[in-house]
Curated annotation (Swiss-Prot):
NCBIfam families: L31, PRK00019.1, PRK00528.1. This is Large ribosomal subunit protein bL31. The keyword Nucleus does not apply. PANTHER family: 50S RIBOSOMAL PROTEIN L31, CHLOROPLASTIC, LARGE RIBOSOMAL SUBUNIT PROTEIN BL31C. Keywords: Ribonucleoprotein, Ribosomal protein, RNA-binding, rRNA-binding.
Length: 82
């Protein structure tokens, strides 16, 4: 028997929302789940190629590792100190 008042609320018809439209329903502990990419618009499933830059990943990579090919210094590891 599960303990009372320790389990999250279960929503058997939780809505998956992509670009403001409900794309599917699933069971979840949240009533609504907002996603940017799902199987209906993912390039692998649709057969199209497009660049997806989520939260500036490319910019972050260029900032961190962009100067390595130009003779720049390597980034420090977390434990290394100068």
């Amino acid at each position: 028997m599960p303990k009372a008042d320790i389990h999250p609320t279960w929503y058997p018809e939780a809505k998956i929302i992509c670009n403001g439209e409900v794309v599917m329903t699933v069971g979840s502990t949240q009533p609504e789940i907002h996603v940017e990419v799902w199987s209906g618009n993912h390039p692998f499933y649709t057969g199209t190629q497009k660049m997806i830059d989520t939260e500036g990943r490319i910019d972050r990579f260029q900032k961190r590792y962009g100067n390595l090919g130009k003779g720049g210094s390597k980034p420090n590891k977390k434990g290394d100190q100068k």
